[in-house]
From Swiss-Prot:
Function noted in UniProt: Low-potential electron donor to a number of redox enzymes.
Cytoplasm among keywords: no
Name under which the protein is recorded: Flavodoxin
Family indicated by similarity: Belongs to the flavodoxin family.
Entry coiled-coil feature ranges: none
Domain Flavodoxin-like: start-end pairs: 4-165
Cofactor(s) for this UniProt protein: FMN
Gene3D superfamilies named among the record's database cross-references: 3.40.50.360
Length: 171
């Protein structure tokens, strides 16, 4: 069995594309992709190492498939799981809600005792507010803006994967 589960929700295809890039850099020999719209509680419980891709829609909302999955997510005990988060948002048109969906998922995971890794610097992002902030210098996970900074996406993914992969290899 592959040891890292990469779960994503995607309406436009951006988050799915990013999930596939993350899988490419981690290695498809050790990771599996799951669309959250076709995911069961057991699918997540089968992995100790998880990556969740959560885009933000409109005014800070969780993408519709993730929104449908939230009641199930709230039931899962994450105490023996390591979880990394990535998300997509638009820092210009939705500057006051930038990647808020990551904050929503983070709160559920923390409440359910997940070990969350993969914080990402806020440097070079321009937004007013975000519920995805660990503090003023870091987001809870990798934040990507395919609308305004698509040219930085692949570099950011490579750097983030380098940061998180040791956690998956040593636990």
């Amino acid at each position: 069995m592959k040891k890292i589960g990469i779960f994503f929700g995607s309406d436009t295809g951006n988050t799915e594309k990013i999930a596939k890039l993350i899988q490419k850099y981690i290695g498809d020999n050790v990771s599996c992709l799951y669309d959250i719209s076709n995911t069961s509680q057991k699918d997540i419980e089968d992995f100790n190492f998880l990556i969740f891709g959560v885009p933000t829609w409109y005014y800070g909302e969780v993408q519709c498939d993730w929104d449908d999955f939230l009641p199930t997510l709230k039931k899962i005990n994450f105490s023996n799981k390591i979880v990394a988060l990535f998300g997509c948002g638009d820092q210009e048109d939705y500057s006051e809600y930038f990647c808020d969906a990551i904050g929503t998922i983070y709160d559920i995971l923390k409440k359910n005792k997940a070990n969350i890794i993969g914080k990402w610097s806020t440097e070079d992002y321009y937004f007013e507010q975000s519920k995805a902030l660990l503090n003023k210098k870091y987001f809870y996970g990798l934040i990507l803006d395919e609308d305004r900074q698509a040219n930085k996406t692949e570099y950011r993914i490579k750097q983030w994967v380098k940061q998180i992969i040791p956690y998956f290899n040593t636990h």
